[in-house]
């Protein structure tokens, strides 16, 4: 049995396109670390199961149902299958609590990884700025790694991603998103014990990876291991090993947006804003993000604070407030029962008759066997 009492649960907090997948992949190479990505069941399932002590077979089945119901669509290719969770839960059925069940769910990820030495879970999340205080209360011993990236590079990478997906990018929308999410992270982590939080810059991670990884493992009370620097070799092996099992959409997604994971860590994507964004774009981004970005150690580097608002930007600004602030804040402030009902109405019909379908954008069904 897994020593669940001594398994620590920790989190990487960031916005998208910050190198968080790179950091998670590096950490996942460590024999004592299990690092998974962007499935926030630790937040979604805790309220319902926190006080459950009598774990019957029906309770286990319901837990698995809820796990899929709340899926964020990021299960493939990192997750195993439903039976993996069921097996883990039944092996520990006599000692289960809500927190233990959630920890065990992590062990169903990366089925090819040897987890015999795992003592530390590191969960990479992009939405915790909405409810970080609740998560910190749910797991009072958890630690938080806040990963940042220069907002100008972050916006540029997101612009490129939007173009690849044949969307029309908005510099204002993306800059305001970076600024809002990191402002919330600063505000909420400031209320926590400083020993629970560690700031890491993407630029430092790729420039001096060994040094940064040593800082992180020390923060997590773990020994440093050089194997973390060889993440690219492991990812190549995993993709090759699972070539027939991984869907075409996943392969395309990995090729488009995570191609760097199959390369050695390098600084080729640092300060690319200086060459690929216009002066006007850089000044807009810096004007919006200046106050927050300086708290993460970024400087103007020639950018100026300007008056940038134009009437034509109103639509993008309005969309930002609705998409990134109003709608999420309304949803996450709802009572748990109402959020659960919304998920059931929207996705519940896909989880009937043992098909365990999910809104996972990589695939349409997750077989029960």
Residue spans for each PLM region:
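PAPS-dependent sulfotransferases, especially Golgi type II membrane carbohydrate sulfotransferases
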Residues: 1-11, 223-369
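The Walker A (P-loop) glycine that initiates the GxxxxGKT/S ATP-binding motif of P-loop NTPases
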Residues: 13-14, 124
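ATP-binding Walker
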Residues: 17-18
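A conserved segment at the C-terminal end of the G1
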Residues: 21-32
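Catalytic donor-sugar/metal-binding loop of nucleotide-sugar-dependent glycosyltransferases
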Residues: 31-35, 143
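Catalytic beta-strand/loop signature of glycosyltransferases that borders the donor
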Residues: 36-39, 226-228
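PAPS-dependent sulfation machinery
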Residues: 38-124, 128-129
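PAPS-dependent sulfotransferase catalytic domain
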Residues: 109-230, 238-260
